[in-house]
């Protein structure tokens, strides 16, 4: 595996470092990390993972083949300005939400190979559903290397960049909607008489079991739903209540609004990049 440099050392960078090292595709000494000013964080990651903190930009970029942009999106202009002179022919992988490939290339001032990635927070346990898109400058080997790296934190799916707003809505923000559903289930369980701990255990196992049924059976969710819905039974009564409450419409509206907001943020960053370099 090529040597990897993380510019930014937050939670997503740590999740990726953890996944990469657990997978065994590279060694700790082949991972370099840097950030803007937080030395304590770099020391923490060094002590935890035995990776290499590096403040010397020339050394950092001379020794790395893949650069992962993992700082906060709002810091993109300043951060990319500070590293632009050191980027040669490395592959750039961006986990910066809202920044398109074109915007990133605009900040760098040239058409370099860029992989734009949308992971989710389950990367922390190597269960991320990650969508990624590639620039036309990325080679076949670049794509293979990026996919191998991303698969250390979960599943990785190559999509056209125009679909990344949808990926953001479904996968990027998706865990929050699952957690919100579980919150509602916990409240409902307590309302019908269960204590909080019992409710939580039952709900989490039900969610895990239902997901595994979908993955292992190969059946469509509609078929599995119908298999446990008896005419005049308890499940039918509950599903009717969901329908009366416009459950499906609420979910669709949620996803549409998330995708819409993702597109708006994308345009804001693009506009800021053009204004900065006009």
Curated annotation (Swiss-Prot):
Phylogenetic classification of the source organism: Bacteria, Bacillati, Bacillota, Bacilli, Bacillales
Superkingdom as given in the UniProt entry: Bacteria
Pfam families in the cross-refs: F420_oxidored, P5CR_dimer
Gene Ontology molecular function terms on file: pyrroline-5-carboxylate reductase activity
HAMAP family linked: P5C_reductase (MF_01925)
SUPFAM superfamilies attached to this UniProt entry: 6-phosphogluconate dehydrogenase C-terminal domain-like (SSF48179), NAD(P)-binding Rossmann-fold domains (SSF51735)
Sequence similarity: Belongs to the pyrroline-5-carboxylate reductase family.
UniProt name for this protein: Pyrroline-5-carboxylate reductase 2
GO biological process: L-proline biosynthetic process
Gene: proI
Signal peptide: none
EC number, as in UniProt: 1.5.1.2
Localization: Cytoplasm
InterPro entries per the UniProt record, alphabetical: 6-PGluconate_DH-like_C_sf, NAD(P)-bd_dom_sf, P5C_Rdtase_cat_N, P5CR-like_CS, P5CR_dimer, Pyrroline-COOH_reductase
């Amino acid at each position: 595996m090529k040597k990897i440099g993380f510019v930014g050392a937050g939670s997503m960078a740590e999740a990726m470092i953890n996944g990469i090292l657990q997978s065994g595709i590279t060694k700790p000494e082949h991972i370099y990390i840097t950030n803007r000013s937080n030395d304590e964080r770099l020391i923490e990651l060094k002590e935890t993972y035995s990776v290499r903190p590096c403040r010397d930009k020339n050394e950092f970029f001379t020794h790395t083949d893949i650069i992962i942009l993992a700082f906060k999106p709002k810091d993109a202009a300043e951060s990319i300005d500070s590293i632009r002179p050191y980027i040669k022919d490395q592959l750039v992988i961006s986990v910066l939400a809202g920044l398109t490939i074109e915007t990133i290339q605009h900040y760098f001032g040239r058409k370099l190979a860029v992989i734009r990635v949308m992971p989710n927070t389950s990367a922390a346990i190597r269960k991320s559903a990650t969508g990624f898109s590639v620039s036309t400058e990325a080679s076949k080997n670049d794509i293979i290397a990026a996919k191998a790296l991303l698969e250390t934190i979960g599943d990785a799916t190559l999509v056209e960049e125009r679909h990344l707003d949808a990926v953001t809505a479904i996968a990027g923000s998706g865990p929050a909607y699952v957690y919100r559903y579980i919150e509602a289930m916990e409240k409902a369980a307590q309302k019908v008489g269960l204590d909080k701990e019992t409710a939580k255990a039952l709900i989490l196992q039900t969610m895990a079991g239902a997901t595994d049924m979908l993955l292992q059976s190969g059946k469509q969710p509609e078929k599995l739903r119908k298999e446990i819905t008896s005419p005049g039974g308890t499940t039918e009564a509950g599903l009717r209540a969901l329908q009366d409450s416009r459950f499906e419409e609420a979910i669709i509206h949620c996803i549409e609004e998330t995708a819409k907001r993702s597109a708006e943020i994308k345009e804001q960053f693009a506009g800021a990049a053009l204004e900065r370099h006009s």
